[in-house]
C-alpha cells in the first residue's frame, strides 16, 4: 500500500471535528489503547501510541516501492505547483522553476563527468543552488556527502579520498583549500551567497565579498578546475542523454555528518538510503506534526546533519511549504529572521532560542505588543535545556498569542534525523511532570525504543540507561567505517550513546551522554550531568555544566562552570564554595 503523504498531512485538520478534541491540532489521544495490561517494558508496551491515531504505527511502516527521494519530492512539487518553493533575500523561486533547476544541474553534473553511485562532497551551508544540486545528485544516482564544517585536514582527506568532484561555499574556502586543491579533484564547483540574489543586491554582495577575500587572503584561485555556478550550469549543454537512472534498492541517497557523540571514532559520515529517507517522511506524517501546506519554514542551518537536511528542507518542501532560506546564523540574526519572516516552522539550538526569548522579554518590557500567533511548530533540541527556562519560554509564547507551545525533540543522523518530538497532546501531559530535565517527546510512529543497562538488559519505566532505537529510518552504516558500523548497529537496534529514561506514557527524557561520568574511589559511577542539573535547580542559576580535569597524580578535579541569572545579587564566587 502506497500512501499519499501530502494528503495525510492535512488529514487531522480536515477531520478534527470528528474527534471531540476542540481547537487542537495534532493527533487524537487514543486512550482506549491503555486498557491492555502493561508489562513495564517500553519496547513491548509502546505506551506512546495512545497519542497517535489508531493505525499510525502500521501506516508509518509502509514503504515507497521503487521510488527515490527525488521521485516523491518531484510529485509534491508538481502537486503544489502554485506555492513558492524558496524565498531567498526577497527573491521567490517557484516550484516549476525549482524543478527546472534540478534537471539543469543534473545535466550539468553529467556533463562534468559525475557518474552513478559517485560520492560528491558538499562543504558549506544551504543556498538555492545547494537545494537543487542535492536533488540533482539523487536524480542521477550519485550521493551528496554533507561534510562536517569543523574537521582536521587529515579527516577532510580521509572523508573525500574517493571523490573526484566537490562543491564548496567560497566563504569557507580557507577551511578546505589545502584539501580541495588536491590533483585528484577533477572539478570543484564554487557556490557564493550572491549567486541567487536579485540585482542590485547581487552585485553589491559580490563586490564586498571580493574585498573581504582580498583582505583575508581567502579568494578562490582562478584555475580551470575551480568553476563558478554560472559556468557550471553551462556544462549542461554538453550532456543530451538521459539523466534519470533506474531505481536501485538500498542505494546511498545522502551522507550526513554525525555529531560525533553517538560513538567514539572521530568524524563519521552517516549513510541514508532512499528507503530510509522516505521512511522519515512517512513517520512524520503519521506523527501529525504541524508542517502544513502553504506555511513557511525558516531554513538557516547547514545541511551537515540530517536534522537540518530533513526537517528544514526535505520534509517542508515535500509537505507543500515555502523555505525561507537565510544562511546567516547568530543570536541577534535569529531574532531578526524570526520577526521579519514570521515562519510557522523553526528549529534551532537552545542558545538561539534563549537569545530569541530574551529579546521578546525586552520588547514586552518596553510596552510593545509582540505577535507570535503564527507559530505552529517551533522546536528545540531538548538536551541540556533548563526546565525553568523552558517553562518561561512557553509562557511567553502563550502571552504573545501562540496557539502552540515550544516543542522539544530529539534526533540523530543515525536514524536520519528525528526519533521523538512532542505532539500537542503529549506536550500538555509533559508540562505536568516535575523533572530535572525536560521531556524530548514521544517516539515517532513506526519506531521502537528501549532503555538498556551496560549488559544490554532492558530496563523498566523510570530507570536510566542507554537508549536503543529500532526504525526503518536507521542508517545503512558509517561511510567506509565497517567496524564502527558493527558497534552502532546490533540486531537492528541503533545505539545512541545517550542516557535516557522513559515513563509509563512513553515520554522520553534525555539526561546526558553515557560517557559523561567519573568513577569514584568505591568504583561507583557518577554522572556529571547530575551534578550540573542539581546546580541548575537553583533559581539563581541560568545554566551550568561540569567537567573532569585530570591532575598530575592521576586523580581528577571536578570543575563546575556556572552562568548566573542577570538578576542574581550576591557573591557569585562564594555561593557554591562550601557546597
For the regions a protein language model found, what residue spans apply to each?
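Conserved ATP-dependent adenylate/AMP-binding module captured primarily in the ANL superfamily
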Residues: 149-181, 197, 280-298, 330-344
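Conserved AMP-binding A3 loop
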Residues: 94-96, 244-246, 253-279
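Gly/Ser/Thr-rich phosphate-binding loop
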Residues: 188, 203-207, 219, 227, ...
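Conserved AMP-binding/adenylate-forming
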Residues: 88-92, 106-151, 300-302
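Conserved AMP-binding/adenylation subdomain of ANL enzymes
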Residues: 141, 278-296, 304-347, 354-366
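N-lobe entry segment of adenylate-forming
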Residues: 2-93, 97-112, 195-220, 242-246, ...
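AMP-binding/adenylate-forming catalytic core of the ANL superfamily
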Residues: 471, 476-477, 499-579
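Conserved ATP/PPi-binding loop(s) of AMP-dependent carboxylate-activating enzymes
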Residues: 425-428, 436-446, 457-487, 507, ...
